[in-house]
């Protein structure tokens, strides 16, 4: 039954963020190491890796919750393998350790930094809504959260910057680069598994006709 459901629901939870990441991943060399930060971006990336059938070595933090770890982890992954690295990070996590750009730029490390920019503290904003709050606190642009001009930041460090869409091709990585993916600020993390439920009983719930097919 699990295999039947997997086939039937293969793209059920492929939202725009997962779609963008999947397009990027399909062109990545198998020799590259992928690293992920913490937040909604990490879960979208997990789904995209399955959807795009990626076989690269991929490093996650999962429940350790070390927001902002991606750049430091990417540096370590490069020196461990001496091969290019692609780091996936949200706009908030990126700002937690942005000073690591100096080391990456100074040593011209072949690291591509992919920023999933939804101009918000996405996971915390989602949890505020799930908890029933009718307002946000420092998680959205109108409640105190802000981001810099990433293209200007890349220029300041002497790093190439690109804004990517679903047709963007990530070729050979021979020096630092920054790639910005624009994610809608209303893109929430789904599905989710509420505490105490069976693992197949996710939210939002599937149409019974589809689930019982």
Predicted regions and their residues:
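Active-site diphosphate/adenylate-binding microenvironment
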Residues: 1-80
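Thiamine diphosphate
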Residues: 44-213
């Amino acid at each position: 039954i699990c295999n039947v459901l997997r086939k039937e629901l293969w793209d059920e939870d492929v939202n725009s963020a997962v779609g963008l990441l999947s397009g990027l991943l399909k062109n990545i060399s198998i020799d590259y190491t992928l690293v992920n930060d913490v937040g909604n971006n990490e879960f979208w990336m997990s789904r995209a890796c399955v959807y795009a059938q990626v076989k690269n070595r991929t490093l996650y933090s999962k429940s350790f919750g070390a927001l902002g770890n991606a750049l430091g982890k990417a540096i370590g992954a490069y020196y461990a393998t001496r091969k290019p690295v692609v780091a996936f990070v949200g706009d908030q996590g990126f700002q937690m350790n942005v000073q690591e750009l100096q080391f990456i730029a100074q040593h011209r490390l072949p690291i591509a930094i992919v920023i999933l920019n939804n101009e918000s503290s996405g996971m915390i904003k989602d949890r505020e809504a799930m908890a029933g709050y009718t307002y946000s606190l420092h998680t959205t642009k109108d409640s105190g959260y802000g981001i810099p001009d990433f293209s200007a930041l890349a220029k300041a460090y002497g790093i190439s910057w690109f804004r990517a869409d679903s047709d963007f091709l990530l070729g050979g990585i021979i020096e630092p680069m920054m790639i910005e993916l624009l994610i809608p600020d209303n893109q929430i993390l789904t599905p989710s598994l509420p505490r105490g439920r069976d693992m197949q009983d996710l939210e939002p719930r599937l149409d019974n006709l589809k689930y019982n097919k």
